[in-house]
């Protein structure tokens, strides 16, 4: 690659939860230019083949355009929204939310283990479903004792397999929520969810009336203190990620708040393991979670009162043992 050429990483804003992946230039999007002279050291670990496949090198504009047409230049979207004076919108607190998410992950993996053992037995050699779950648990650093405990639990008398259910809810201010459940007692779970929604002012929605507002993605969450943003972008590009979402900032953030922010790498099912491997190779720690989330296609802005009420409703839903996750399209 010629020394005078520049390599651009196009960072397109993840606007309202929608990835604007087809836009190459826009005044509404943040553009980051990485020049070869400034990034040779950062790119030293990337092979020539990988560099060629992900970046466009050219000395003239016409050559750039030809390369854009010939190569699939991957565009990584990233946003840095500033939330002015709305500290109350930090749903359950960033650290608390991550701790809760980790606990929910362990619980869900345990449920999946129970279901797999109930259906195919405790031997992962003959039970491919269990083998897949065990691989996932290892990949996500789920403690071994949790897995072993739930393998034993599956053989207990009266223990039933777990079933996945989705419940859709309307919150305050036109906000929608999706509640993911993995339960061995459907009647118990729906009764508990309906009770919480009613008690905290929400409304149960008909099936399908909310889900279309979200999209399912594979994600990797990385604490901002664990990696430099530019480093993450290089890793994401090299591993075939689709987007990198930068966490929101608040004007009244404390140092502790800033340390509890997380980047979110969005990728496909096929590239998910590759992303994790690349992060491990680079010594970047990531948060163990199930790697699957619902992101809103658009977001709804509400006033402070509605925001607090939605926060309380979400918290109460997440306190239910059968509930694994709650997703919201609130801005």
From Swiss-Prot:
Known Pfam families for this protein? TACO1_YebC_N, Transcrip_reg
Which Gene3D superfamilies does this entry report, sorted A to Z?
Answer: 1.10.10.200, 3.30.70.980
Q: Which GO terms describe its cellular component?
A: chloroplast; vacuole
Q: Spell out the InterPro entries in the cross-references.
A: Integrase-like_N (IPR017856), TACO1_YebC-like_2nd/3rd_dom (IPR048300), TACO1_YebC_N (IPR049083), Transcrip_reg_TACO1-like (IPR002876), Transcrip_reg_TACO1-like_dom3 (IPR026564), YebC-like (IPR029072)
Residues in the signal sequence: none
Similarity section: Belongs to the TACO1 family.
Q: Which HAMAP family match?
A: Transcrip_reg_TACO1 (MF_00693)
What's the name of the protein?
A: Probable transcriptional regulatory protein At2g25830
């Amino acid at each position: 690659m010629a020394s005078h050429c520049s390599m651009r990483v196009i960072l397109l804003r993840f606007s309202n939860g929608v990835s604007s992946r087809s836009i190459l230039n826009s005044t509404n999007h943040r553009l980051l230019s990485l020049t070869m002279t400034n990034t040779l050291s950062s790119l030293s670990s990337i092979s020539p083949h990988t560099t060629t496949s992900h970046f466009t090198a050219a000395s003239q504009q016409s050559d750039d355009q030809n390369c854009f047409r010939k190569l699939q230049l991957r565009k990584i979207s990233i946003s840095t929204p500033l939330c002015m004076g709305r500290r109350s919108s930090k749903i359950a607190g960033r650290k608390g939310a991550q701790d809760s998410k980790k606990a929910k992950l362990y619980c869900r993996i345990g449920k999946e283990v129970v279901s797999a053992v109930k259906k195919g037995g405790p031997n992962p050699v003959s039970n491919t479903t269990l083998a897949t779950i065990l691989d996932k648990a290892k990949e996500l650093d789920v403690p071994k004792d949790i897995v072993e405990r739930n393998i034993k639990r599956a053989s207990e008398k009266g223990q039933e397999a777990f079933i996945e259910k989705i419940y859709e809810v309307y919150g305050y201010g036109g906000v929608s929520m999706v509640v993911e459940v993995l339960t061995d007692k459907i009647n118990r779970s729906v009764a508990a969810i309906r009770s919480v929604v009613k008690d905290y002012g929400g409304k149960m929605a008909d099936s399908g009336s909310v889900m279309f507002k979200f999209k399912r993605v594979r994600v990797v969450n990385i604490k901002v203190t664990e990696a430099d943003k530019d480093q993450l972008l290089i890793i994401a590009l090299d591993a075939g990620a689709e987007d990198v979402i930068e966490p929101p900032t608040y004007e009244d953030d404390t140092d502790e708040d800033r340390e509890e922010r997380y980047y979110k790498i969005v990728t496909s099912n096929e590239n998910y393991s590759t992303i994790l491997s690349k992060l491990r190779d680079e010594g970047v720690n990531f948060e163990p979670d199930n790697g699957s989330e619902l992101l809103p296609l658009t977001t709804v802005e509400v006033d402070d009162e509605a925001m607090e009420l939605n926060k309380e409703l979400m918290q109460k839903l997440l306190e239910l043992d059968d509930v694994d996750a709650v997703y919201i399209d609130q801005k």
